[in-house]
Each structure stands twice: as structure tokens, then as C-alpha cells.
Design a protein with these regions (language model features):
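Membrane-embedded alpha-helical bundles of multi-pass transporters/translocases
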Residues: 2-469
Length: 469
């Protein structure tokens, strides 16, 4: 069947298997990396034996390494054209070592060894960049069609949250399944069995690798730089592009704020349930699972919601919804009469997560827009560089999110071996789950108000680019 004129010019419509295949790449990364983000601090403090403050400093150091490493990867993938595909090749080339390092992060063979923790965590993070930066660039290489990108992003986030659900609900159950019964600290606690955590990460990482291979098999790059353009790509292009691409700067600062919020909130969720709400393992699984379930309801509706209220208003609405959920989570913990009402906690977590998922999920649809804007103004489509920049900023956000929980827990006197924490420690956990994330959401709302690329403007930009091709 012959291509339509629009398809010949890059405005491709993907079939559902291709959309699901692309989304499987994000689901795979969540099975691996979200497990790291959500549970590694808990593993380090409660199983591996690291002090929370020491772990916090390590998270910061690793993010500093990322600031150096990400632009190198971005320039490298833009400059080279592997036989397996310009961007998709790294799903395999980076996915295999990522899997190995992720598994080793949860091995307790060198319990308490800070050197081992650094080597495995730095290695995992560098390999994740080698997968994530090209994967992000792959999005903008599949099509220029803005409506298709919205559908593609919704599918991607649906799949990503399917992986997130498996992590948030499945990890507690899986760890308990593999636990040998001798490492439980109180009936409400997560098992502190190193073998159980290792086996759990082994299972999740291997499944994630399988989905990376599936993503590779279902994607085809259609909108990429030619050989002449790639020859001129260099690392310094990263900061040049950042300086002249205003929408990219706005999006970058939104990324750092959003990921800081998510990292703080995700890392503290297990502490909130275990020490503030004194939950059972089953209750913790439900709570963590509700962090992903709203995706299956709301992400398929994003194209219609965006069409109804507009891009910016959609951000405003769902960021506000998330803040409301955080307020309720705070009140449940501090009002004695509500502490036993776990159903209120579940509803609040669902509401908070619905807002966070839609707002932070749709932000990925803006990345191809800023790539196209850069191509429109300079004539160069450096998707890898742009995704390296967004990678730097979302990892900077994760750095803040990784440092803050450990430091706060240390400052308030958190004791991992105590099932009942002091009032100050409980208040510190509340700040991590509710107050700090809510303040970051307010900042994110202000930042996104400065984003200026409407759908109509993007249609004009993409048509202008194709007319020059």
C-alpha cells in the first residue's frame, strides 16, 4: 500500500501494536528503574545497613555523575548510526548491562559496604542513561503528527504505569513471598531479608529486559537526521540548544520540579504507611498500587481531556487535584480520629496519584514539540541532545528527591529498627509525603504557565519544517 502524502512527509499514523510496543519500553524501564527509585532507599536503610544521610549523599553524587554522563550519551547517539537503529539499538546495547547492575544493587553479599553500593548504583545509573536518552529520542523519530504523538504518549504512560503498578503493589508481595521468615520486624513491616529482595529484583529486571526486546522489535525510526547533519553534532550543542530554545528551558525546569516531587513522595511512601499509619504488608501493597491504578482510567482519556480544556488547563487542573490528595493524606495522619480510617488514605492516595500521573505523564508529549521547535529555528533535529538535556534535569530533580528524604529522616532522628517513631520523626515523614511535594507542585504550576507552544503553533511549525524537506 502506498504512503499518503502526509506519511511521506513524516506525519505517520502508527498501528496499535507499534504504539503498545513503544510503550513497552517505558514499562520495562519502570520495572527496573522505578523499583530502584521507590525501594532502594528502604533497602539501603533497612536491609543493607546504610545510614540514611550516607545514602542521601550517595544519591547526590550519582546525580552529579549523570550531569556529566548524560550529554556525552546524547551527543554520542545523535552522532552515530548503529546498524540496529539510531536510537532503538540502545534498548538492547544498554538494556543488558542495565539489567545486570540493577540486580546487583539489591544483592546483600557486601552488606554495609559503601564502595559496593557506589559501584553498583553508579553503574546502574549510567546504563539507565544509555537506555533512557535514546528511548526518549525514539519518540520524536516515530512521527511528526501532534495528534499521533498525544495518542502515543498516552499509550506509553498507560504502559509505564502498568509497570509502576507491578512495582508498587507487586514488590511488597514478592519480597514477602521470597522471605525466609526470619527477617520480619513486627507484623506490619516489610521483610528485611536480603535474599528476598535480591530474588525480587532478579525477577523484575529479567521481565523488564524482555519488554525492552519487545519494544525494539515493534519500533521503526522514520524522522531522523541525515548523515551530513550527524557528523556535526558535538557535546557543546547541548548548552547551545538550551540557551536558544525557550520552550526547552521551560520544559527542563518543569522536569526538575516534577521529578523532585515524585522522587520525594515515592521514596517516603513506604515510610508513611509503615511508621505513620502502621499498616500491614497488604495495606502497603494497596496504597503503593493506588499510585499507578489511576493511569488505567485517566491516561486513555488524556487526548479527549486535552481537546476539551486545552493543554495548559489540563496541567493546572490535575496539579491542583494532586495537591488536594496530599492535603488529605496529611490530615489523616495528624487527626487521631482518622488514623484508623484506612479507606480515606486509599481515596486520598488515588486522588493524589491521578493528578500526578496525568500531569507528569503528559509532559513527555512536550519533548517532541521542543525538538521540532529547535529544528524549526536551527534546521537541525538533535533529538538525542534534547533528550539528554531533559535527562539531566529530571535526574537533577531525582537528585533533590533522593537527597531530601535521607537528610530529613536523619535530621528528625528516624530509627529503622524501631516500629514506633518519635512524633518528630513521624512529622518529618509527613513533610516528605505531603508538604514538600505540594510546594513543588505549586512551583511546577507556575513554570508550565510559561510554556508557549500550543497545538496550533506546533502544526504550523511541523508543516514549515516539512515544506523545506
Amino acid at each position: 500500500m502506498a504512503q499518503t502524502t502526509n506519511e511521506a512527509k513524516g506525519f505517520y499514523k502508527l498501528n496499535w501494536m507499534q504504539r503498545i510496543g513503544f510503550g513497552a519500553g517505558d514499562m520495562a524501564q519502570n520495572l527496573i528503574y522505578q523499583t530502584i527509585s521507590m525501594w532502594l532507599l528502604f533497602f539501603y536503610t533497612n536491609v543493607f545497613g546504610l545510614n540514611p544521610a550516607v545514602a542521601a549523599v550517595m544519591f547526590l553524587v550519582v546525580r552529579i555523575v549523570d550531569v556529566i554522563w548524560d550529554p556525552i550519551v546524547g551527543a554520542f547517539v545523535d552522532k552515530h548510526n548503529p546498524k540496529l537503529g539510531k536510537y532503538r539499538a540502545y534498548l538492547i546495547l544498554g538494556g543488558i548491562p542495565l539489567t545486570v547492575f540493577a540486580i546487583l544493587c539489591f544483592w546483600n553479599g557486601f552488606s554495609g559496604s559503601l564502595l559496593y553500593a557506589y559501584v553498583t548504583y553508579v553503574g546502574m545509573s549510567m546504563c539507565y542513561t544509555l537506555v533512557n536518552v535514546p528511548y526518549g529520542a525514539l519518540n520524536s523519530s516515530l512521527t511528526r503528527d501532534t495528534n499521533e504523538i498525544t495518542v502515543l504518549t498516552s499509550t506509553r504512560m498507560f504502559m509505564a504505569n502498568l509497570g509502576g503498578l507491578a512495582v508498587s503493589m507487586g514488590i511488597p508481595a514478592c519480597v514477602k513471598l521470597f522471605a525466609r521468615g526470619s527477617e520480619l520486624v513486627g507484623e506490619q513491616a516489610m521483610p528485611a531479608d536480603g535474599h528476598a529482595w535480591f530474588m525480587t529484583m532478579l525477577v523484575y529486571s529479567l521481565i523488564g529486559l524482555a519488554f525492552l526486546f519487545f519494544c525494539f522489535s515493534q519500533t521503526k525510526e522514520r524522522v531522523v537526521m541525515d548523515e551530513k547533519e550527524t557528523a556535526n553534532v558535538k557535546v557543546s550543542d547541548l548548552w547551545t540548544e538550551f540557551g536558544r530554545n525557550r520552550p526547552l528551558r521551560v520544559l527542563a525546569f518543569f522536569f526538575i520540579t516534577a521529578f523532585a516531587m515524585m522522587s520525594v513522595s515515592n521514596a517516603a511512601g513506604s515510610y508513611y504507611m509503615q511508621y505513620n499509619m502502621h499498616s500491614t504488608t497488604a495495606q502497603m501493597s494497596i496504597f503503593m498500587g493506588l499510585g499507578s491504578i489511576p493511569a488505567f482510567i485517566f491516561m486513555p482519556l488524556v487526548p479527549a481531556i486535552k481537546k476539551l480544556v486545552g493543554k495548559k488547563n489540563m496541567f493546572y487542573i490535575f496539579l491542583s487535584v494532586a495537591m488536594f490528595g496530599m492535603i488529605v493524606l496529611y490530615l489523616v495522619s495528624v487527626i487521631p480520629a482518622l488514623r484508623s480510617q484506612m479507606w480515606i488514605v486509599y481515596i486520598a492516595q488515588f486522588v493524589k496519584s491521578a493528578g500526578v500521573i496525568v500531569a507528569t505523564g503528559y509532559m513527555w508529549a512536550l519533548v517532541p514539540e521542543v525538538v521540532a521547535f529547535g529544528e524549526y529555528t536551527t534546521g537541525r533535529r538533535i533529538a538525542g541532545i534534547v533528550n539528554a538535556l531533559t535527562g539531566i534535569f529530571f535526574k537533577a530533580g531525582m537528585a533533590l528527591g533522593g537527597v531530601v528524604p535521607g537528610l530529613v529522616l536523619s535530621l528528625v532522628g528516624f530509627a529503622a529498627d524501631q516500629s514506633n517513631q518519635t512524633p518528630l520523626a513521624e512529622q518529618g515523614i509527613l513533610w516528605l509525603v505531603c508538604v514538600i511535594p505540594a510546594l513543588l507542585l505549586l512551583l511546577a504550576m507556575f513554570i508550565i504557565s510559561k510554556y508557549e507552544l500550543s497545538d496550533e503553533r506546533m502544526d504550523e511549525i511541523n508543516k514549515a519544517i516539512e515544506s523545506k524537506a
